[in-house]
Regions:
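Short, positively charged and aromatic/hydrophobic N-terminal segments
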Residues: 7-17
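Flexible, Gly/Pro-enriched loop and linker segments at secondary-structure and domain junctions
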Residues: 22-50, 70, 163-205
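Acyl/amide activation-and-transfer machinery of modular secondary-metabolite enzymes
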Residues: 41-60, 111-135, 205-211
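Acyl activation and transfer enzymes in specialized metabolism, enriched
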Residues: 58-84, 206-225
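Small-residue-rich loop/turn and linker elements
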Residues: 87-130, 162
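Helical lid/core segments from catalytic subdomains that handle acyl or acyl-like groups
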Residues: 119-174
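Active-site-proximal acidic secondary-structure segment that organizes catalysis
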Residues: 138, 186-236
Length: 236
């Protein structure tokens, strides 16, 4: 009982701290105007880039400090995406303003981000939670551990509808060269996926696949994010 009340108080505190809202913006007033016009009409607007990362430092910190490798990687991802302006904008299909059943593409701007994490729950299924991006590792780790433990036990997702979400998926049952996600037309947020890291003689490597909607960003923005992610991993 007290555990449930504690979880409820935690969620209420988080909601009180984050009362900001996403805002609809005119694509023509942004640097995504042409891309938005072109790629929201495409039958396949998603792009996947795969880069092999040197995660030697990440693995050492994980072992030395007793922190989860996946948590550390998600923290690094959050720090990297927060430095790229294009991540704060996301196209979405929404009902038209005339009240009909028609749908249209709109562009939204967010002022905060969260990392979506998937966890195995006690019923043998999967549960999801959104962990707020933070520059502070201890804060992020506390939120990550609390939320993943909560969804594991309750089998109830904890999601943040007012943050731009960066999806993640760790398929650690095997080493993988690349993961290509399918486009459903529903889940269009940025998405990173990886398998098991490879332990070599001198370094540990991990291929990470990054999928994004081309209306949201171009290849140069994605490349800058991947370079920034590697830099942050090295500097942790």
């Amino acid at each position: 009982m007290f555990g449930c009340l504690g979880n409820f108080a935690y969620l209420c505190k988080s909601l009180q701290t984050n009362k900001t809202m996403k805002q609809e913006i005119n694509p023509k007033d942004t640097n995504r105007a042409i891309a938005f016009e072109l790629w929201t009409k495409s039958s396949m607007p998603m792009v996947t880039l795969t880069k092999t990362f040197d995660v030697t430092r990440l693995r050492k910190v994980s072992r030395k400090r007793g922190l989860k490798f996946n948590m550390l990687l998600c923290w690094c991802i959050g720090r990297a995406v927060s430095k790229i302006d294009e991540f704060y904008m996301l196209p979405q299909r929404q009902p038209t303003d005339d009240g009909t059943s028609e749908m249209e593409w709109k562009l939204y701007k967010y002022d905060r981000m969260a990392i979506n994490v998937i966890a195995d729950n006690v019923k043998g299924g999967l549960s999801f939670c959104d962990v707020a991006v933070s520059d502070d590792l201890e804060t992020f780790n506390a939120n990550y551990m609390h939320l993943t433990e909560t969804i594991t036990q309750t089998c109830q997702d904890i999601l943040d509808d007012e943050a731009v979400i960066v999806g993640t998926s760790a398929v650690t049952g095997t080493e993988l060269d690349s993961i290509v996600n399918q486009y459903s037309g529903i889940f269009i947020n940025p998405f990173l996926a990886w398998g098991r890291y490879h332990k070599g003689w001198l370094k540990t490597t991990l291929p990470i696949s990054f999928q994004f909607h081309h209306a949201q960003m171009d290849g140069k923005h994605a490349a800058r994010f991947l370079e920034e992610l590697q830099r942050i991993i090295h500097s942790i």
